[in-house]
Curated annotation (Swiss-Prot):
The keyword Oxidoreductase applies. It comes from Macaca fascicularis (Crab-eating macaque). It is found in: Cytoplasm. This is Carbonyl reductase [NADPH] 1. The gene is CBR1. GO terms for molecular function: 15-hydroxyprostaglandin dehydrogenase (NAD+) activity; 15-hydroxyprostaglandin dehydrogenase (NADP+) activity; 15-hydroxyprostaglandin-D dehydrogenase (NADP+) activity; androstan-3-alpha,17-beta-diol dehydrogenase (NAD+) activity; carbonyl reductase (NADPH) activity; prostaglandin E2 9-reductase activity; S-nitrosoglutathione reductase (NADPH) activity. It catalyses: a secondary alcohol + NADP(+) = a ketone + NADPH + H(+); prostaglandin F2alpha + NADP(+) = prostaglandin E2 + NADPH + H(+); prostaglandin E1 + NADP(+) = 15-oxoprostaglandin E1 + NADPH + H(+); prostaglandin D2 + NADP(+) = 15-oxoprostaglandin D2 + NADPH + H(+). NADP(+) binds at residues 10-34, 63-64, 90, 194-198, 231-233.
Amino acid sequence: MKSGIRVALVTGSNKGIGLAIVRDLCRLFSGEVVLTARDVARGQAAVQQLQAEGLSPRFHQLDIDDLQSIRTLRDFLLKEYGGLDVLVNNAGIAFKVADPTPFHIQAEVTMKTNFFGTRDVCTELLPLIKPQGRVVNISSMMSLRALKSCSPELQQKFRSETITEEELVGLMNKFAEDTKKGVHQKEGWPSSAYGVTKIGVTVLSRIHARKLSEQRKGDKILLNACCPGWVRTDMAGPSATKSPEEGAETPVYLALLPLDAEGPHGQFVMEKRVEQW
């Protein structure tokens, strides 16, 4: 085991914002950086691309939709490093606006990865986070937009300081069920499946931060959700306003908060500023 060596890991990091975050961490983080991807060939190609730039990330396979894949990664981190110092949950999916896939299937598929996949990674890897560790969950300003389009009842639930992870899971499942029945609008949901999944990520971040403050008070771990902005990626398309490098700025800022920092913690951050949830 490489005891004493710090390690940072970014999910879904073979391209786009994830790759830009890995590049910055390779330059700025004092420790090893693990690039992950579902597809081994694509992940290794991304590592080679960074090696050509004089950087040296490690690669490990990770499909956040596959619990066994997450657990294999967990075991690797424990064996190699005895834990994890920085976790950036970047992996996620979105359907294009013009995609003909029925809405309820879009909702189910997007929810499975963006919320449940991210939650599974947190379940397995948060216990590995070392004192003064940093966790960054990539959410989206779409979560704030979707929240404001929810019914007052749903808004109240999602803004609650006491909502539990189980209650949040119940709400995310209800959204998927309501879309299947075609009653999601009647039930107070917005019409963006992606937005609802990112409400889930933001609220999950608030819950996990609260738990860390309660259960690991002295460990000074900081966990936040953030929006990278509208970034030119395969997901957002070519007309977006930011480059991937610009999109990486806020996530990297949160991943590298000084070790003596008191916050932000449990916040939703955009352009390095805390946004009101």
